[in-house]
From Swiss-Prot:
Binding site for a divalent metal cation: 171, 216, 281
Membrane-crossing segments per the record: none
GO biological process, one term: pyridoxine biosynthetic process
NCBIfam families: pdxA (TIGR00557), PRK02746.1 (NF002744)
Enzyme Commission code: 1.1.1.262
Pathway participation: Cofactor biosynthesis; pyridoxine 5'-phosphate biosynthesis; pyridoxine 5'-phosphate from D-erythrose 4-phosphate: step 4/5
Keyword Cytoplasm belongs to the record: yes
Protein name: 4-hydroxythreonine-4-phosphate dehydrogenase
Subunit and interaction comment: Homodimer.
Organism: Synechocystis sp. (strain ATCC 27184 / PCC 6803 / Kazusa)
Intracellular or extracellular location(s): Cytoplasm
Entry binding sites for substrate: 136, 289, 298, 307
Length: 349
């Protein structure tokens, strides 16, 4: 990491059949980004040229970057076949997979400090023979890390308060969640979260709210036994192991998000925690997307470099129409630059 210059970010195009190229062109036209980072896109100039021509033909007033003038690492994969806008397939999956891997290779080689990824389609990856659950798992595999997690960060445009949420489990069926949750898993995720808060946000003595699994956190075993069986005992041990953190919970899931809702919408000074640890995908992401859909950013913690991405998908249904919003991608770029800057600051002891 080069702490003597502006953060060096590499931005992938994501699936070229989705809204990735559109939101990348819109983000690169955003004034002010050049003052906070050195931003390089990685992908195919032909894809960006075609996207720009198509969008401007529909709406000449769109503010789009010119592919001929942006910093671009060319990865020409046109030989793989034709891209059909709005339709993810084996061709678009192979291309987006190649974009990501080239970005990882360059970052691991020290050319960049952070990767910002536009969205991909898991179905397109699978059609191309790449059977990863998502970009997060590819990043972890290529970086050689076994302990990693998905965290979501959003800053309220109303109050300035920042919501930080980590998922203990991610893309697994709901019926598998109780078996996947173990004290060992929770310890690993909590350690990642505490490291992230200290390293990336400068919060060395955080408060962390931890959700229960069952309605009313099991209501003393009447609505589920996981809290009594292991979650409460685990929390008691965790409080001893991590005295620097205030660990609150297990909190009934239906009330854990009341404080964040108030802090996000009306009162940034209300009583809230520095971070929220949700036990499964929808428990954490329904409130995140309800409050912060256009501002929420996915960041992978546990990697040796910064990675962020917008918290939305490829949106094939609106690709090529010029109506995709770049807010989340712009926020992802800004957050990546902030996290790189934070990692360059001396850590408080």
């Amino acid at each position: 990491m080069d702490c003597m210059s502006l953060p060096r970010l590499i931005l992938t195009l994501g699936d070229p059949a989705g809204i990735g190229p559109e939101v990348v062109l819109k983000a690169l036209a955003e004034p002010g980004l050049a003052s906070i980072c050195q931003l390089t896109a990685i992908g195919s100039r032909s894809v960006l040229d075609q996207t720009r021509r198509q969008l401007l033909a529909q709406n000449p007033g769109l503010n789009l970057a010119d592919p001929e003038t942006i910093n671009l690492l060319e990865v020409d994969l046109s030989y793989l076949g034709k891209i059909t806008v709005g339709q993810g397939d084996a061709v678009s999956g192979a291309i987006s997979f190649a974009y990501l891997n080239e970005a990882i290779t360059r970052t691991l080689a020290g050319e960049f400090d952070a990767i910002v990824t536009a969205p991909i389609a898991k179905s397109a990856w699978q059609a191309a023979g790449h059977n990863y659950p998502g970009q997060t798992e590819v990043l972890a595999h290529r970086a050689g890390v076994e302990s990693f997690a998905m965290a979501f960060v959003g800053r309220s445009p109303f109050t300035g308060w920042t919501l930080r949420t980590l998922l203990a489990t991610t893309h697994i069926p709901l019926k598998e969640v109780p078996q996947a949750l173990t004290p060992q898993l929770m310890t690993a995720k909590l350690e990642l979260l505490l490291t992230c808060l200290a390293q990336d946000f400068g919060i060395s003595n955080p408060s962390v709210a931890i959700a229960g699994l069952n309605p009313h956190s099991g209501e003393e075993g009447k609505l589920g036994s996981e809290e009594q069986d292991w979650l409460i005992p685990w929390l008691e041990q965790a409080r001893k192991k991590y005295p620097q953190a205030q660990l609150i919970g297990p909190i009934p899931p239906d009330t854990m998000w009341v404080g964040p809702g108030k802090a996000w919408l009306t009162d940034g000074q209300t009583t809230v925690s520095d971070a929220y640890l949700a036990l499964y995908h929808d428990q954490g992401l329904i409130p995140v997307k309800l409050l912060a859909f256009d501002q929420a950013i996915n960041t992978t913690i546990g990697l040796p470099f910064v990675r962020t991405s917008p918290d939305h998908g490829t949106a094939f249904d609106i690709a090529g129409q010029g109506i995709a919003r770049a807010d989340s991608l712009i926020a992802a770029i800004k957050l990546a630059a902030e996290l790189v800057e934070q990692r360059c600051r001396p850590r408080a002891q």
